[in-house]
Design a protein with these regions (language model features):
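Flexible, acidic active-site loops/lids enriched in D/E/S/T/G that coordinate Mg2+ and/or position polar
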Residues: 1-70
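Short acidic, glycine/serine/threonine-rich loops at helix termini
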Residues: 26-28, 56-58, 77-79, 131-137, ...
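Acidic beta-strand-loop-alpha-helix segment within the catalytic core
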Residues: 64-145, 208-213, 220
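Solvent-exposed alpha-helices and their adjacent loops that cap or buttress functional pockets
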Residues: 6-7, 32-38, 46, 54-58, ...
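Residue-level signal for inorganic ion chemistry
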Residues: 5, 148, 168
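Oxyanion/phosphate-interacting regions
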Residues: 156-221
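Short acidic loop-to-helix transition motifs that present clustered carboxylates
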Residues: 21-23, 128, 147-154
């Protein structure tokens, strides 16, 4: 990926990379890529979203790059994780990450014109999501638990032909930015809230100018 980006005629700057979080040697935050000519761009990269999936030869691992005009992409690199809510176009103006998950499921079911028990929600299978998964099931919806790959999970939730209707929960901030780009292209709904792991990370985000309490919409991301 790094070698390819070096051939592109643009002045690219990595806004969100994987370097610090995953101890990667390149494509780090702030790195300049491209030929140095052409438009100035922001870049978010996720060389492999779903490393374990790739190692096991399973589906839903992706290699992704998101590119936007310089200054338009949220630099959330100081906070590694983000809580996200993603749906297809039916969820636009209907669901809201600030609402209880059960209410969002019922609202989306109404917008889609199908019963709640036919709604399927994808969630990363992590201990931090145990209560969220139980609340989804208590609401009457089905769950699709992902071992990895929440970019694919978000994209599938926004695709008309996919078998999931919503993707929720805490995943990586880089994945959130990349997912937002895809969801905008698909006309779907995405909201995100930064999820600092401790007080030090929270303060690091505040020092970087991020709002820890803000709900970031697609255009913000």
């Amino acid at each position: 990926m790094r070698a390819f980006l070096g051939t592109v005629a643009f002045q690219g700057r990595v806004v969100i990379g994987e370097g610090e979080k995953d101890n990667a040697p390149m494509l780090f935050n702030g790195e300049e890529v491209g030929t140095g000519t052409g438009p100035e761009c922001d870049i978010a990269v996720d060389p492999i979203d779903g490393t374990s999936l790739t190692a096991a030869g399973r589906q839903n691992a992706l290699s992704v790059i998101a590119v936007s005009d310089r200054g338009s992409m949220l630099d959330a690199s100081s906070v590694f994780y983000m809580d996200k809510l993603v749906t297809g176009p039916a969820g636009v103006g209907v669901v809201d990450i600030r609402l209880p998950i059960g209410e969002n499921i019922r609202k989306l079911a109404g917008a889609l014109g199908k019963p709640v028990d036919e709604i399927v929600v994808s969630v990363l299978n992590r201990p931090r999501h145990e209560q969220l998964i139980q609340e989804i099931r208590d609401a009457g919806a089905g769950t699709r638990l992902m071992s990895d790959g929440d970019v694919a999970g978000g994209i599938n939730a926004a695709r008309h032909a996919a078998r999931t209707d919503m993707c929720v929960g805490v995943g990586g901030s880089p994945e959130g930015i990349v997912t937002a780009c895809a969801i905008k292209a698909l006309g779907g709904h995405i909201q995100g809230r930064l999820w600092p792991r401790d007080d030090d990370e929270r303060q690091r985000g505040i020092d970087a100018g991020l709002d820890m309490d803000k709900v970031y919409e697609a255009d913000d991301l």
